[in-house]
Amino acid sequence: MSVHALRELFKHKGEKNYEVFSMEDFIGRLESEIGLNDSVVSQGRSLISSISHENFGTVQATDIQDAAAIYNKMQMLVNDYGFERVSSSDPQVRAREERVRENQITAATMAAIACADETKYIRALRGITKAKASNEDHVKVVQHQFNGPAGGIQVFENGVGLENYNEKSQRDFRVVTIGYNLAASRQDEFAERIYPTTVINPIEGGVVQVLPYIAVMKDVYHEVSGVKMDNEEVNMVEAYRDPSILDDESIALIPALDPAGSNADFFVDPALVPPYTIKNEQNLTITTAPLKANVRLDLMGNSNANLLIQRGMLEVSDTIDPAGRLKNLFVLLGGKVVKFKVDRLPRAVFQPDLVGDTRNAVIRFDSDDLVVSGDTTFIDGSADGVINDLKTAKLSLRLSVGFGGTISLSKGDSKFGATDTYVDKVLNEDGQVMDNADPAVKAILDQLTDLAVIGFELDTRFTNTNRRQRGHLLQTRALQFRHPIPMHAPVTLPMDTMTDEGPGEVVKALTVNTNIRNSNNAVKRMLNYLAQLREVVHNGYNRPKFGIIEGALSAVMRPTYRYKELDLEKVIDTIKSKDRWDDVCAAILNCVKAELFPAHRDSNIEAAFRVISGNQDETPMYLFCSDKEIANYLMTKGDDRTLGAYLKYDIVSTNNQLFDGKLVVIPTRAVQQENDILSWGQFFYVSTVIADLPITRGGHQVTREIAAIPFNLHVNNIPFALEFKITGFQKVMGETQFNGKLADLKP
């Protein structure tokens, strides 16, 4: 052997240039320092007693300093031995890689603290598996289901099986514990993108997620007594989708018919326009109808004002808001009534009365564009008589209507009426003006001898200064979701592995199994959650409510699930082989877009992201999750904006056979934060302790084996998923479609 070879053989480990991480050398370094006072294990003694507390590492200054010192030393150690370095130039990829790296170092740091007093740490592990009951409405203890159509996950809840940890280990596995948690606290790329890892300390009762919740309060009253019944709260996220949630109709002025009929003369004849009943936000039931034109009346005295005063919503000094308008006109036409909505037409709004009382408002409405055609219906829903004749003759009428009046805002005294109503012109289907002498036109006009405005409705409110100053009353609180972390089936090795192969090989063997199992569990949890979503949505449930479906965001957004099957052989008809690739890509993406775009809108997910994050520019990124075959077709040639310019996306794939032929599209955050509730899912990892434990084999034989007992949980946050089953790749890409089409045409 040459001198150079001997030098390389005996070269000090610290002088090596590590291109990849060496677990053996890292473990060797830990072993050489394990007994020193400044080792990572020795430094953790001061922290072990408080590690199970929810505020661990965030309150006591000494805890923060000690934990940071251990983390920094652990980071230095792994860096010395070539631990994975972030190299990507893409900022988002770099952020994800750095987050995974930090989580692994954090898991190793927690393991080092655990090794300072394994007995106390194991006691804390027992606490994290047990549900911690709460009587508070805003604290939800989540009980997870670990079985489903995609298979079950073997877990032991409530600390079952931890009794074996009571026995003293016969070997020192502290360095193995640190190395194992460093390597085992990550999943494969597919699982990590869907369920990014968050390392947590063994908190009693499990990990806690916090969701900011904002609601607008709606006052509700008993109809008879006026005693307040409750404050109904409406999720503010829903207001993005449904703006009527923020409408305040509590002080609307509604003309009210007296059940005894004492004020019936102020309303349109019920034989022409039947009265109808409405219920306002205060649970008050009011019977109303259009007001009669050309009649003087006290608008306040014939309204719901007295009901509102009785319930404390108004005072007797409240006046009518000057920001009112004419809402609807009711026109008699050939013996029946047509309603015209005019509130958005010019001159329909109240204007100040410049002559006389300054507390008066006036309306001077006129229009030559009220249309009556064959598509018009009377208020009873019919379209007979003159309407049917217009449809048969393919004609339409343009009515000229003048309507006006004055109202005292302080007293309610008012009078409104029509100044003139007539047919301005008759048009044919080409928009040409017809001669009134035309027989068809004359026959229709002869039926309109009763043409007149007989009634109207106003859109008015009371001023109610106190109510205005109050505005929208909001309710804010932090919803807490507590998840007990289950114990999984142990991963074991024969005891002699430690002696024969060394601690480095023990760590490798245990972590290979753990990594694969955690990654497979992620696929199972995802597919089982999709089945749960499918059942809930197909049963017709489409409103936010936690408990109906798993996921913290179910409290603020509508559960969404859509399923589509795509047989490429039925949709691809390319003649030229060179075009087939592009057509397959386009067919898949068009299928996704047809489902995703309306689902994005209807689910209200964008509003949920903005309210929860507090960032008005926050939007979800859509993750395309597929098998290895489909992933190759998910890019549009020459354009990486697969979802257009508005929605962001990314692609991740797995070779797990449970995902064969599947494409699942889910929303998530582009760059997840620690314990990020806006990630579609999360993987909570708790550092565990490696020991040699008695394991029963075959029901009788008991052997001592090296055991790693994982504590972790995949949690689903966002109740939104689109699932596609795609088939026909082999037929489309591997066979000539043109010949197939010709064969179908042969007699």
From Swiss-Prot:
It is found in: Virion. Cleaved by the capsid maturation protease during capsid maturation. GO terms for cellular component: viral capsid. Keywords: Capsid protein, Virion. The keyword Transmembrane does not apply. The record marks 24-25, 54-55, 84-85, 97-98, 118-119, 136-137, 163-164 as: Cleavage. Capsid protein self-assembles to form an icosahedral capsid with a T=27 symmetry, about 120 nm in diameter, and consisting of 1560 capsid proteins. The capsid encapsulates the genomic DNA. The 12 pentameric vertices of the capsid are occupied by other proteins. Homohexmer. This is Major capsid protein. The lineage of its organism: Viruses, Duplodnaviria, Heunggongvirae, Uroviricota, Caudoviricetes.
